[in-house]
Amino acid sequence: MVSTAKFPPLGERSANAGLPHLQYRSFPAAEANPALNDATLVVVMMEAVEALEHIEEIAAVEGVDIMPIGTNDLTTDWDIPGQYDDPRVAA
């Protein structure tokens, strides 16, 4: 996911001219990519039991910035949709 979101050398995202981050101006990639990477936030939603089982591995990935819990999908994956008072949700 990080490689898809970030520009070289941190990722593989293709750059194009006129991005809002650069006020729609064209810049050489050597200048633009570091600025674009700094402005790109990688958010990995934790919405499945399998994701929680691997949360430490996912958190260790260089470039992952935020990992919020998607309680709607998670409670559905636990077959308790919308039961936010379940002890597993609080944990």
Regions flagged by a language model, labelled:
Residues V2-A91:
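Expand to "…catalyze enediolate/carbanion chemistry for C-C bond making/breaking, isomerization
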